[in-house]
Amino acid sequence: MKFTDIAKVAKRDKVCYIMDDVDGSQWLNTMDAVYRLEGLPKMTSDDFLNLLGVPEDKKNKWESGEMFDEAGLTKTDRFGEVELTADPAGISVFYNGMCLTPFYTTDGVLWMDEDLLEPVRKMDSKYLAFFLRGEKGRRMVAVKDGLILVAVISPVVMNDDFMDKVNIMWRKCRQERGWEGVEEYEISADDLYHGEGAESSEAEPTDAGHGGED
């Protein structure tokens, strides 16, 4: 992964924790994602901020520090992890300032922030693979380049507001499918709002696809 792509994620949330693993490798931890740092000298979080060009009087606006991976978050292989297919749904949605891509699992779906995926998506790799793994009661996505772990990324929490908007979108798509194949002369202006194919005449929320808190 390129340093500039990893730095972009850190700058977005102003979070920079430099984490050492048991093998002596270093990682950037933004609390939403962990990325392997390669081709760089050993550094502290202050060194990382200096590389970003953050002025001394602005560093106090960052959440930063050093940590050691005692829990084994960066362990290459974890018991029970399952390989995923990236973007099997073939769709992304924009919500609360994020572009979210669904990753299907055998028992649900994980919505992943594309900003967090960008550093690994832009890697020059033909062997990139995604794995579902558990971590302290939650599910994470581990990204490997061949046999080497390069990132561990948290999915976005699906709150009630997000689920409501997805349900509205699904219902509206079902309604629209009801008009497919209907000849234009068969549709009146009134039908467009109160047709028999409509599941509800309730007005669609004007903020659909925006707002809400994660």
Language-model regions, residue ranges each:
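Intrinsically disordered, low-complexity linker/loop segments enriched in Gly/Pro
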Residues: M1-D23, W27-L37
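C-terminal functional regions that serve as terminal interaction/effector modules
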Residues: T30-A33, G53-D214
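Exposed alpha-helical structural elements
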Residues: K2-D5, D47, L116
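Short amphipathic alpha-helical linker/capping segments at the junctions of internal repeats
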Residues: P41-N50, N159-F162
